[in-house]
Amino acid sequence: GIDENVCTMKLRENIKSPQEADFYNPKAGRITTANSQKLPALRSLQMSAERGFLYSNGIYAPHWNINAHSALYVTRGNAKVQVVGDEGNKVFDDEVKQGQLIIVPQYFAVIKKAGNQGFEYVAFKTNDNAMINPLVGRLSAFRAIPEEVLRSSFQISSEEAEELKYGRQEALLLSEQSQQGKREVADEKERERF
């Protein structure tokens, strides 16, 4: 019965281990999450956790939390963090250091860029299966939007719309030197046609 389920429930998850990373970029860092899929005990708490380890100047792509608020505690290093509210206004734009805590509300966009010494943090989220939506990179929603719509919406050229859609091949963790060549952009466009 229920006693048997509680007694056999997994109660620990190592989110510090590099082998457990959910996202990894050898030039930018790694992100590991603990949610109710990995650790069912979190379902009853309605919480999840994320551990970020960004290398020197690594970037966690701009994204927003779809279904959770986030409390981010810096465990080592420093980073430039920008948070933008749901109406497009900047609500935070500063450096955070070891020992500091920052709250990022649901739907607010956030970007983190590690300092020269790198950046490590733990974020606690108010949903047992917290989800994010990246604004750039291979997993960005912009990839699904036709170029004509992007050009019209943002009043940009065809080249700028193409760069917005295909400019970064990385998924979530970005490095400063990660801009891909035009050939890869063209190859990606060609693949999406089929």
From Swiss-Prot:
Task: Could you list this entry's UniProt keywords, alphabetically sorted.
Answer: Disulfide bond, Seed storage protein, Storage protein
Task: Determine if Disulfide bond is one of this entry's keywords.
Answer: yes
Q: Which residues form the Cupin type-1 domain?
A: 13-162
**CDD domains for this protein:** cupin_11S_legumin_C
Expressed, tissue-wise, as follows: Cotyledons and endosperm protein bodies.
GO MF term set:
nutrient reservoir activity
Output the Pfam families linked to this UniProt entry.
Cupin_1
Q: How does it assemble?
A: Hexamer; each subunit is composed of an acidic and a basic chain derived from a single precursor and linked by a disulfide bond.
Q: Which family does it belong to?
A: Belongs to the 11S seed storage protein (globulins) family.
Q: According to its UniProt entry, what is the function of this protein?
A: Seed storage protein with a relatively high level of Lys and Met.
Question: What is the official name of this protein in its record?
Answer: 13S globulin basic chain
Organism from which the protein derives: Fagopyrum esculentum (Common buckwheat)
